[in-house]
């Protein structure tokens, strides 16, 4: 089971990783606008979620942690990529409502709700972006949960699915292939 403390620590760790790799992600940013700010925007967005995590006790439920992260990210969202990231977390949070701890099936289902929320919010969803990476990750997580409900097993499948999907983004978006890069937002979610 994933505890609230583990989820809280994962949000903080993810924020630290994105911040550390911000420049690398900024340099990948060519779609939809080559303005080189995806890493910055996403680090600010998840950074807001990380800041909210600092106030939470070790014994908080996964529901409360997910809701606090999602609310803070929505308020702190910057740019298109940050808004999409916050929507993924908002849906993820809805998927974990009323959970004290989360098993693998709940984790995968929550991610799928997050993906659905993000796709619905984007006027013209484009494949080869963070949306694709998150969708494939959620699909891999759901398939893994059918085999083994262990959240670590499911999380590993989610991460592998995200990495696999990220590698395909240049095949789905010719502008990425031409530049020889993967999708910047997808890089963060992988």
Model-derived features: where do they sit?
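N-terminal loops that bind phosphate or other acidic moieties
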Residues: 1-190
